[in-house]
Amino acid sequence: NDWKVITVGDSHAGALVSAIAEAQQNGDAGVVEWTYSGCAFIQGLKNISAVNVAIHGSDYKCREFIEWAEDRLTALPANIPIVIINRYAAAAFGNNEHKLLVDVPLVYFSKVLTRTTPEFLAEFAQHITQGACELAKHRTVYMVRPIPEMGFDVPKTLSRRMALGVA
């Protein structure tokens, strides 16, 4: 295959993959996108069913996506680097644009929590680090720092303001 880099993560990875392609020295050929909306690529991550069914629908398969991507990575040549991009804040603290879900984790590892706690954040960080280090044993891993949270849907808000002439 002609793959040069794999971008993996949630919708934030999907939003940034074109920038990664643009950064390629010889054009965008070979940039592969493995993304699943609302699904942070973190080893051992489990989604809280009721919350994710409400947000994504009943056929949401985040854990299966993560397992698929991990399996695929083991079968690919080690010279293909991976770029991990996730909206970690939403997974750990809930969607800040949905006021009822603030400080309610959308994911868990060992036990489901109704509030974000320091213990949960430590476990969250441990899984991010362990997963990246495990991948780095076999290939180069790049992790994109968190994208700033705005607390509202920026494209929707700006388009409405533009339509109303308030922008």
Question: What label would you give each PLM region?
Answer:
Residues 1-167:
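Extracellular glycan-modifying ectodomains
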